[in-house]
Amino acid sequence: MKKKIRIYLFTTSRAEFALVNYLLHELRKNKIFITKLIVGGTHNLSNYGKTINEIKDQGHKIYKILKSFKSNDDPNSIVNYIKNDIGEINNIFSKEKIDYVVIFGDRYETLSIVINSIMHQKKIIHLGGGEITEGVIDDQVRNIITKAAYYHFPSSEFYKKRIINM
């Protein structure tokens, strides 16, 4: 019997959920993969459409909902959100056998899972690395994820070259 591969996917916003949705459906077609979905960021906020309901409507079982995110964009709120999620994700990573963690894009909400992946030596699969968003912290966050990632799936050859040059 082949060893099951445990893949945890982390989604933070509607913007990347179409990719998460597609990947979950594809992975679940193959019995070798065990997938678990961790939902955080804006998915649970009413003022962002409470998109957690869309995730459930797609038939996905949510393994963990991270509820510490608030819509405040000030640095103190963001750091507190990340701090709280570091602890929650640490509890998961301490107990679970995880082979890979899938992270999409560049949102600061992902930093808590990146830190835990590094500390618990979990391999990060990053989708959307190498892209450029000038004038905001997205580039810095994306580059942190890219540097921490074990596997990269850039959206174009240009972005692939940017990752290689890092």
Where does each model-flagged region fall?
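Short N-terminal targeting/anchoring amphipathic segment
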Residues: 90-107
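Structural motif
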Residues: 10, 38, 103-105, 127
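N-terminal subdomain of nucleotide-sugar transferases
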Residues: 1-42
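Helix N-cap/beta->alpha junction signal
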Residues: 13, 106-107, 155-157
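An aromatic- and histidine-rich active-site surface loop
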Residues: 102-119
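Conserved nucleotide-sugar phosphate-binding/catalytic loop shared by glycosyltransferases and other
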Residues: 34-81, 88
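Active-site-proximal region of nucleotide-activated glycan assembly enzymes
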Residues: 122-166
